[in-house]
Amino acid sequence: MKKSIYILFVLLLLVSCSKNNNGYDALEKSLIGILEKKDYGYIMKNLNESAKAGNEDVYGLAYTYLAENGTAFFNEYMKKSKGIAEYYEALRLQETNGDEAQILGLLESAAKQGNIKAYYMIGNIYENKLEFTKAQEYLKKGRDAGEIYALYSYEYNKNLTNFYKRIEELNKKFNEGSITTEEKKELGTLVLEKVSNYEKAYDILKDFLSENFSPSLYAKAKLLEKDDKEEEAVEIYNQIFLQNKYYLAAFELASRLVKNQKDYNLALKVLDDTNSDEVLILGYKGFIYENLKDFVKAEEFYQKAISKNDIDSMNYLGRLYETKKDMKKAKNIYNKAYSLGSISAGYKLAYILEDEEKEKNPEKTEDSIKQSKEAKKILERLSNSGDDYSMVDLSLYYPETDKMVRILNLAAAAKLNTTAFYNLGVYYYNQKNKDKSKFYFRVAKENGYDIGEVFNAYITE
């Protein structure tokens, strides 16, 4: 399906699964201080203490707390943090529309110091500039270094090589002012459909609104959606669909029929009317058939999308196989998607591997510690990529009083993961630390986590 890059979310995922306890006491004091809204001086003292101890997780917490005011903190640790301070300062500049050359310079420095996440960032910047050849150079470096987001983007882009070459050709003409009207329409449509860059597509196509050119109207509708003008956007989607059954408009209408009305049959009719074989439509048809319990048709459409190398559809097909209890097929398709950089597939694959381990060694099923070495290896990689849910799950591979349970859940809690707050409550409960256990249970509960009757009673003692 269409590639969606959730920039802020992804870029914040820079947490190392450290094997030592350096700086975690100070990190925890900072976290508690932030949650309890303690004074700035206390929080900064502990953030600095954690950074000076070599803790790598503290920079993400500092970024969240300091936001646009983080320059002084990050500058202090440049050339001292394996490129992490440079990375977060680049992120801060990007969020505040800072100088692009400075951002790229910081990221290049971060990459040279071993921060492989910077390769993904640099590649993403060049993608947004429609310089895909350059983007792929950096994404390949990230892929080769084992960075999973770079791997996913590199593999995704590879499937669109011919389209991206054409975009680069047309964009050069556009920038030189030598592009024809038809070429301009082609460029804007490609940027819209293959890059999903609605702002840039609209800038290119806005001159064609007066002639009701479907891609230009669609780009306008997406920007209206972004401004919370849902009704106006849907009105345009209906207009475009009635006009020429434009597949992107059909998807927007079908997805709303499913989400708001659960009208799967009408949604399917809307998609059928487009006669489109785009992976977005094929994959969504599979999803609708799955909800209609027509698993044969669902698999057929997922496979059609997968034949076009759509990674998202691999995940959906894996879920379908799980529903059908065909775990061998689910495992195989998740493994394929994971090898192409899908974090969600890796997560699901780890669950299957753990279940297989339990079947092999039923005598260990009463042991609360998870056992699969293969699953643990996957979760370690995902944790190192910054996925907080994987950090929480990885902590289950250690004895409940092990220091890694605390470290992994602190790293996830710094991202405000509610399960991590609960797990820290349990950890300190087992350590007989009433103050901290009650604190974390309260935070978990305040953030919507069901801590259960026993711990609800415990925090009110």
Predicted features by range, described:
Residues 37-38, 97-98, 130, 162, ...:
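Residue-level detector of the short coil/turn that links helix A to helix B
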Residues 15-16:
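C-terminal motif of bacterial Sec signal peptides marking the signal peptidase cleavage site
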Residues 47, 74, 107, 139, ...:
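Hydrophobic/aromatic packing residues within the alpha-helices of TPR/SEL1-like helical repeat arrays
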Residues 43, 70, 74, 103, ...:
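Single-residue signature of alpha-solenoid repeat helices
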Residues 94, 127, 159, 192-193, ...:
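Position-specific recognition of the canonical hydrophobic site in helix A of tetratricopeptide repeat
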Residues 31-32, 64, 91, 124, ...:
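Residue-level recognition of tetratricopeptide repeat
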Residues 53-56, 80-83, 113-115, 145-148, ...:
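Short helix-capping/linker turns of helical repeat alpha-solenoids
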Residues 61, 88, 121, 153, ...:
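Canonical tetratricopeptide repeat
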